Each structure stands twice: as C-alpha cells, then as structure tokens.
C-alpha cells in the first residue's frame, strides 16, 4: 500500500525531539504530512537534535518546532497561536500524538536488604569452578551485560548484578500528581485545546504511548504506571465522546525500545535483556517500527480503529 498524505494534513507531536515522537515525525514527513513538534530541551542538547529536525524539513510539507513547556498554559497558547496562523489557509491537524516522557522514577517503598542479589551465589559457584575471583567474574559479567549485544545481555541477565536504586527519597503525593498529569491526563487538555480552536481535521487521529508497566509492576515505575493507566482511560473517553466529530483515539503499547527515556529508568539494562530474551524475534523493538505502525493508523484505511490499546512489540508480551 502506497501512503501519501497532503501537506495540508498536519501531525502535532508532543515530545518529538527523540524516541517514538521523532521517529514518527520523520516517518509521516516522508509521506508528505506537515509536522509540528513540541519539545523541551536544553540549548546544549539542540546540536544533537537539529540533524533530526533537518531530516524532517527536507521532506515535510511544512515543519515547525516549539522548544517550550507543553504542560503549561503559556506553552499551549504559544503553539496554538502559531498553528492557527499557519493553518489559516485550510490546513488541519490529522494526527495529535502524545509522547511526553516526563515522570518521577522514585521508589514507592524502601528496599528490603534481604531481597537483594539473587545471582550472587551462582556467580560465586561459577567463579570457583573457573578458578577466578568472584569480584573479577562479576566485573566481567557486568561489562558484557552492559556493553554486549541484546542476545548476550539476555543470556547473562540472571547472573548480572541487580540494578541500583536511589533510596534517599521515596514517592510522595505530589510526585504522583505531576507524573499522572504530564504523562497521562494532559492528553485530554491538548485534545480539548485543539478541538476548541477548530484545528482538527474532519477525520483525525489522537495517538498516545503506553508500556507494559500498565499491567506489570516494575520497581521505581509506580508513578509512571499510574500515569499510563490514566492515559489509557482518557484515550477511551476521547474515543467515545469525540467520535461524532470524526476523531479516533488509540493507544500504542510498544515493546521495550532502547531510548533515552528508557535509559533513565532504574534497571533498564535488565529490562532490555529480559525483553530480548523473551521476544520471539530475539531482539528489541525499534522506534522506527513503532513509527511505521503509527503512520498506518493515520491512513484512511485505519479509520475504524478506535478506542483500543494496540501492541507493537513483535510478540514480546505474549511470549512465554
């Protein structure tokens, strides 16, 4: 199927300077869509970000990037003011993508000292059989685990030293509230804002990103997990209440993907190793594969997909 969008069709991507957001911006731009990216990055980071934006500029119908706080009233007003002028000739937002990764990764409970390094005894026995020091073996395993390919890391996962966590602070109510809004319910805020401005296309898509943390408890992920569950609930409500206006809302659950956002999560190396070992294809999901699917959801042929969570993980979630 050949995919071709009109330059009057816009993608508004929240969190579009890296990861899924950037990959999606590049993908839909290559197929002719105009792109608006909202991101928040330090000036020093822009040197690494601009080449990706240049790729989009080279093929998008039109492109604009806003480096500001997408969660503030002022930020939304700036974006909507600019887009209202740009789209005055008839352009409309075909796809609004929520890919904001701004959450608190503190522990919910203190670590139990008795629940520690499950692989320590195995490493000691292996070191003894090999005739090397346990510390030397641990360092070698850690090096291969962190720097080897996905298959090697997956095989060594059970022997690797456990992740380290910041135990100096724990999650508080305000941490939950901020994370749930930034990574969850702010989706509703943006949909309402774009809708009230009359900028949605007659046939539009609202897409957002979730993870298996919506069902599986991961240490240090409690606030983000709560946000993802809220996001999915909000998306279902959008799917029902905005359907009469031609807006379809879905959530994409990507497999474990090596990204800057993932690497911020304590224990991310262990998550990647376990995912690569479990995935039927023996590797991680890529941001580009997820972007390919999101692009498909923007086509006319996907108009009847509404109100669901769609896994894009190569079978990772269902593999035993």
How should these model regions be labeled?
Residues 248-258, 298, 311-313:
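Conserved SDR Rossmann-fold cofactor-binding beta-strand/turn motif
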Residues 216, 281, 293-295, 306-320:
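Short C-terminal tail/terminal secondary-structure segment
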Residues 32-50:
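Conserved glycine-rich Rossmann-like NAD(P)H-binding loop of the short-chain dehydrogenase/reductase
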Residues 2-38:
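Canonical Rossmann dinucleotide-binding motif of NAD(H)/NADP(H)-dependent dehydrogenases/reductases
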Residues 56-74:
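Rossmann-fold cofactor-recognition segment
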């Amino acid at each position: 199927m050949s995919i071709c969008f009109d330059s009057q069709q816009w993608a508004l991507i929240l969190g579009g300077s890296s990861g899924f957001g950037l990959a999606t911006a590049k993908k839909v731009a290559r197929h002719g869509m105009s792109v608006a990216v909202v991101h928040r990055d330090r000036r020093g980071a822009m040197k690494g970000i601009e080449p990706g934006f240049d790729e989009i500029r080279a093929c998008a119908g039109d492109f604009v990037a806003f480096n500001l706080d997408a969660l503030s009233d002022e930020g939304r007003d700036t974006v909507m003011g600019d887009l209202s002028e740009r789209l005055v000739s008839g352009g409309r937002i075909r796809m609004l993508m929520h890919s904001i990764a701004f959450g608190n990764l503190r522990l919910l409970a203190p670590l139990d000292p008795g629940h520690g390094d499950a692989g320590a005894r195995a490493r000691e026995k292996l070191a003894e059989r090999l005739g090397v020091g346990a510390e030397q073996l641990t360092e070698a395993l850690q090096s291969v685990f962190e720097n080897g390919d996905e298959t090697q890391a997956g095989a060594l996962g059970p022997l690797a030293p456990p992740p380290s966590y910041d135990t100096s602070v724990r999650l508080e109510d305000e941490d939950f509230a901020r994370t749930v809004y930034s990574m969850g319910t702010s989706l509703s805020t943006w949909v309402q804002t774009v809708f009230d401005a009359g900028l949605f296309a007659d046939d539009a898509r609202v897409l957002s990103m979730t993870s298996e943390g919506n069902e599986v408890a991961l240490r240090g992920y409690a606030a983000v997990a709560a946000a993802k569950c809220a996001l999915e609930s909000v998306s279902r409500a959008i799917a029902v209440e905005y359907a009469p206006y031609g807006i379809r809302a879905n959530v994409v659950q990507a497999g474990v993907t090596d990204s800057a956002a993932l690497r911020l999560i304590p224990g991310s190396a262990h998550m990647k190793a376990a995912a690569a070992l479990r995935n039927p294809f023996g590797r991680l999901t890529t941001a580009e594969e997820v972007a390919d699917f999101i692009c498909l959801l923007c086509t006319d042929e996907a108009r009847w997909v509404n109100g669901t969570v769609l896994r894009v993980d190569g079978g990772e979630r269902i593999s035993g």
